[in-house]
């Protein structure tokens, strides 16, 4: 295949991702984006300008050699592309699906200055899937054993990354997960139609083949304390996420039919409530469902409600579409599926019937004022604008908080006023030998930011195991 000129690369249009038809996909839980074939992936890869100073790499928390793996796809060497991805990331097939590339690597793609950026995320998905389903990538040999042992708490994106990187460095790694299935938010929070659980399982299989020991149903803070783990291991990484739901604290929030997004999605994703009674966990299958919030979790919840049989799925959001934190792709998918978006509305109370089941949400209309600390325009209530949205199920998706169980048994590991661990940029906590990263440090954020935190922490843990040095300025 001949080398293309820059002009020829620029002349190739960005390839769209094929999707299931919206009216078909709301009747199933299959992945919405169906993926590319080889020819499409090669053609898209040939758009890459192979920059000498690739800003896409600078903007990738997982530190992936993006031009390197894309070049291999363009040459038809798909397994080599996957090898480059796995050298930097334990979860490339996951990231190819859920990472917000449009605000990170693709945002700084030089092609995007005049044309559409190279579809880096879709190419990452293609190459990673190739190695999972078509031609298995040989497991690399780890470094010689160091004799050092590391406990990783939480088998979510940060913990999986730390475990995968440290095992390659020759350390003995045990990954502890509180639930019966590893994956963290990847399995309990993100629906099957956006991230198939098989993908998570296969990527976990890879780090287990490398030698990571996985222990499920192990609740750090109950089964064992952080202090007890430190007696057995040379270092401990805390990546237990932000799994405790936030609530509005308005009247009626304890009515039947009102769920936190955490409970609603966990019942559906992890417990397979949509297969009740084959699976024993039920969930309300409302016909008119309101989801409160504007992030990716809210989009996941409202789209889940449609697949559970809702006639109407509503988003109630107190700002406008412009301020919505959800990925534009997820908003557009929800719009295609018929979700009704109610902007500039704020719930003030839930209304119930004589059986204590929710029947309505009373809202106030809002207008936007000056930007607040988040940089988004602050919503201001319009006096006397109350109205009621009739519903039979409500999902509150306004954020997550730190679960205090782990911190309560971590002597000397300080938390901030919101219960998140205090750590430096490399994940070192206020107690020597204890590291933390991901949502339990930053608050609820993206999968890729948790992966980036995991990579930094893994390097810091490796350094600590080698030299034993610990800064005395953390938290000061």
Where are each of the predicted segments found?
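Ferredoxin-type iron-sulfur electron-transfer modules in oxidoreductases and energy-metabolism complexes
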Residues: 25-44, 64-97, 114-144, 268-269
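N-terminal Rossmann-like FAD-binding beta1-loop-alpha1 element of flavoenzymes
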Residues: 149-174, 298-306
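Feature captures the FAD/FMN-dependent oxidoreductase FAD-binding
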Residues: 80, 144, 149-153, 201-250, ...
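Rossmann-like dinucleotide-binding cores of NAD(P)H-dependent redox enzymes
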Residues: 172-175, 179-210, 214, 302-349, ...
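FAD-site-proximal beta/loop scaffold in flavoenzymes
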Residues: 254-286, 371-444
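Iron-sulfur cluster-binding cysteine motifs and their immediate structural context
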Residues: 50-75, 94-127, 174, 181, ...
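A conserved FAD-binding loop/helix module that cradles the flavin
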Residues: 440-465, 471
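Glycine-rich dinucleotide-binding loop and its adjacent helix/turn
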Residues: 127-144, 202-222, 245-308, 415-426, ...
């Amino acid at each position: 295949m001949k080398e293309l000129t820059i002009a020829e690369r620029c002349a190739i249009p960005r390839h769209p991702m094929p999707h299931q038809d919206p009216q078909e996909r709301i009747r199933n839980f299959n992945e919405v984006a169906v993926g590319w074939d080889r020819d499409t992936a090669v053609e898209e890869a040939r758009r890459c300008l192979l920059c000498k100073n690739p800003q896409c790499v600078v903007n990738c928390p997982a530190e992936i050699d993006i031009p390197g793996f894309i070049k291999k796809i363009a040459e038809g060497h798909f397994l080599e592309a996957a090898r480059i991805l796995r050298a930097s990331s334990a979860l490339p097939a996951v990231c190819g699906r859920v990472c917000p590339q449009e605000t990170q690597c693709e945002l700084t793609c030089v092609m995007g200055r005049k044309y559409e950026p190279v579809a880096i995320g879709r190419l990452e998905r293609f190459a990673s899937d190739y190695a999972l389903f078509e031609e298995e990538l040989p497991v690399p040999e780890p470094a010689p054993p160091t004799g050092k042992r590391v406990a990783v708490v939480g088998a979510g994106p940060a913990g999986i990354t730390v475990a995968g990187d440290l095992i390659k460095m020759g350390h003995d790694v045990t990954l502890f997960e509180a639930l019966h299935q590893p994956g963290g938010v990847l399995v309990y929070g993100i629906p099957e139609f956006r991230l198939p659980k098989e993908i998570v399982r296969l990527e976990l299989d890879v780090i287990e083949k490398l030698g990571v020991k996985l222990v499920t149903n192990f609740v750090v803070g109950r089964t064992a304390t952080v202090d007890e783990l430190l007696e057995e291991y040379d270092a401990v990484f805390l990546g237990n996420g932000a799994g405790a739901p936030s609530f509005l604290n308005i009247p009626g929030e304890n009515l039947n039919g009102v769920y936190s997004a955490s409970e609603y999605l966990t019942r559906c994703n992890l417990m397979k409530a949509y297969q009740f009674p084959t699976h024993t966990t039920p969930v309300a299958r409302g016909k008119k469902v309101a989801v409160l919030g504007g992030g990716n979790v809210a989009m996941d919840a409202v789209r889940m409600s449609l697949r559970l049989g809702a006639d109407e799925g509503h988003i109630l959001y107190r700002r406008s579409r412009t301020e919505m934190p959800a990925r534009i792709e997820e908003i557009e998918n929800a719009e295609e599926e018929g979700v009704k978006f109610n902007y500039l509305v704020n719930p003030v109370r839930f209304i119930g019937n004589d059986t204590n089941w929710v029947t309505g949400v009373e809202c106030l209309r809002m207008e936007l004022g000056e930007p607040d600390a988040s940089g988004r325009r602050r919503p201001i209530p319009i006096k006397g604008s109350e109205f009621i949205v009739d519903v039979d199920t409500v999902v509150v998706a306004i954020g997550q908080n730190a679960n205090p169980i782990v911190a309560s048994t971590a002597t000397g590991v300080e938390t901030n006023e919101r219960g998140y661990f205090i750590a430096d940029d490399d994940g070192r906590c206020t107690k020597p030998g204890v590291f933390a990263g991901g949502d339990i440090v930053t608050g609820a954020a993206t999968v890729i930011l948790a992966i980036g935190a995991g990579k930094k922490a893994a390097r810091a843990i490796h350094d600590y195991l080698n030299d034993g040095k610990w800064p005395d300025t953390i938290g000061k």
